[in-house]
Amino acid sequence: LYGIFQAKNAIRKEDFCFLVEGYTDVISLHQAGIENAVASSGTALTEDQIKLIRRFTENVTVLFDGDAAGIRAALRGIDLILKGGLNVRVLLLPDGEDPDSYSRKHSTNTLTDYFKKNAKDFISFKIDLYAAE
């Protein structure tokens, strides 16, 4: 789980963590002042990674790319996180953006405002997704 050592105090303080896809996403978010982010390091999320997150919080916001691959990864992650007994929210970025590119373009305040306004509980996320199909 990439970045957990650097993020653990912020995760405890904020009582949630952002789960992103890759290490560049974690680095860019940390540089933008969003320090409670970790990555599954480009691999599929594992039960052991979820147990590690659970040591610091029971709340996870899945922050993946807004493209089709990001949505598929978010769906896989949601089910595994729920199975691990954690609370899940989902935040998709605009199409063509990932946490790395988005955090480079926007200030910390803009990022946190966007994240707060657009994070959805997993049920709303799935309903919106299936309604769009």
Give the positions of each predicted feature.
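Glycine-rich phosphate-binding loops that contact phosphosugars or nucleotide phosphates
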Residues: L45, Q49, A68-K83
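Conserved nucleotide-binding/hydrolysis micro-motifs of P-loop NTPases
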Residues: T24-D25, T43-L45, D67-A69, P94-D98
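C-terminal or mid-to-C-terminal helical accessory/interaction module adjacent to the motor/catalytic core
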Residues: G85-E133
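Hydrophobic alpha-helix feature that most strongly marks membrane-spanning transmembrane helices
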Residues: R55-E58, L82, L86
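Acidic beta-strand-to-loop metal/phosphate-binding motif
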Residues: C17-L19, T57-A69, L91-L93
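Short secondary-structure boundary/capping segments
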Residues: G33-A37, G77-L80, K105-T108
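Flexible glycine/proline-rich, aromatic-decorated loop/lid segments
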Residues: I50-I53, D79-I81, K116-F122
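Phosphate-handling DNA/RNA-contact segment within nucleic-acid enzymes
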Residues: L1-F56, V60, A74
